Regions:
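Secretory targeting and sorting signals
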Residues: 1-28
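A short beta-strand motif characteristic of beta-propeller blades
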Residues: 34-42, 78-95, 135-141, 179-191, ...
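Beta-rich, blade/repeat-based domains predominating
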Residues: 41-58, 87-117, 121, 142-160, ...
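Short loop/turn segments immediately following the C-termini of beta-strands
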Residues: 64, 118-120, 165-166, 212-213, ...
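A short loop-to-beta-strand structural motif that recurs across blades of beta-propeller domains
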Residues: 68-70, 125-128, 169-172, 216-218, ...
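Short loop/turn segments that connect beta-strands within beta-propeller blades
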Residues: 72-77, 130-135, 174-178, 221-226, ...
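Hydrophobic alpha-helical segments and helix pairs
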Residues: 126-175
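Glycine/small-residue-rich hydrophobic helix-like segments
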Residues: 214-283
């Protein structure tokens, strides 16, 4: 996810984003035919932050500042699923931002959704469960100093892994809920200015994550006892990487580069190419999903504050996000 920045950082970020606007469309190679599926209402806080795929190809989406989760069909139709309880002060104590927002999203096989909530209050911040047709219930508490962000489920163990962007920690908690365990800390998770650990995925027995401030993608093996193995740096030089998705079972990665207003394809050797830019319709991308030859990109427009949207493009690489 991405945030409203301090003035100095905002100016620099705006300049970086503006630089992409003068280039030709970057939809190249495996990515083609980009088009906007859905425009959102910025003034209503409808800023799409994270996404989980339904079996039929529909998208479950967190609307960050609105504190909502909704379903979006492949034709752009919308259905509100749940609204998280709003803090009385609007989340004024939320770290870095100063307002509350819904963040990472995970869907289990029975249709239950798990959503991260950074609210600036001990009684609200943490992980919330939304059963089909039900109301949100907090299952794991984090302190007001936490910024739960990207999240993924290890289906082998039933554990959720949560990237905490301000406390520089990867938390682990069972689906049933409970007290989160600090699974991983270390220098690779440090933040220098805004956000540290951000996007998070489970892939082939390892936790993968982005560190936005450090511009890296990291791989952390999970050993047979569930402990974190040595942290491996898989890619560097990325401009504020946010959420990402694997192309099928490979180690090719599509990643949202929020401040650059770009989407990149990262190869297994760590090299990357830009495949989408602002000229294709991006508005500060925060998350991506891959399904049935389609690449979906969520843009929350946190810095641009213009046109939050969901963009879809054709992808000739693989079937579904992992």
């Amino acid at each position: 996810m991405m945030i409203m920045l301090p003035m100095k950082s905002t100016v620099a970020a705006a300049a970086l984003v503006a630089a992409t606007a003068v280039t030709a469309s970057a939809a190249i190679g495996p990515v083609s035919n980009p088009r906007v599926l859905l425009h959102y209402n910025l003034t209503a806080g409808e800023q799409p932050e994270n996404v989980a795929l339904e079996p039929d190809g529909d998208l479950d989406v967190t609307l960050s500042r609105a504190g909502q989760v909704e379903r979006v069909t492949r034709t752009g139709q919308r259905q509100l699923l749940a609204t998280l309880p709003a803090p009385s002060d609007g989340g004024a104590q939320t770290p870095v931002l100063g307002y509350s927002l819904a963040t990472g999203l995970v869907r289990t096989a029975d249709g239950t959704l798990y959503v991260g909530y950074a609210a600036g209050h001990d009684e609200l911040t943490g992980i919330w469960r939304i059963r089909p047709g039900g109301t949100p219930t907090r299952i794991a508490a984090l302190t007001a100093a936490s910024f739960p962000n990207g999240m993924a489920l290890d289906e082998r163990t039933g554990n959720l892994y949560i990237a905490d962007s301000t406390r520089e920690t990867i938390w682990r908690v069972p689906l049933a809920g409970g007290t989160p365990d600090a699974w991983l800390v270390g220098p690779e998770l440090k933040r220098s200015n805004l956000l540290g650990p951000n996007g998070l995925r489970i892939h082939d027995g390892a936790v993968w994550l982005s560190n936005s401030d450090q511009g890296t993608l990291l791989r952390v093996p999970v050993d047979r006892d569930g402990r974190a193995g040595p942290v491996q740096t898989k890619a560097t030089g990325l401009t504020f990487p946010d959420d990402f998705a694997f192309v099928g079972h490979s180690e090719k990665i599509i990643v949202a580069l929020n401040l650059a207003n770009e989407v990149a394809l990262v190869q297994p050797n760590g090299s990357h190419t830009i495949v989408l830019t602002g000229t294709d319709g991006l508005e500060g991308p925060t998350a991506v999903a891959i399904d049935d030859g389609q690449l979906y990109v969520l843009s929350a427009s946190f810095v641009l504050n213009e046109d939050p949207n969901i963009l879809v493009a054709d992808l000739a690489l693989g079937p579904r996000s992992r």
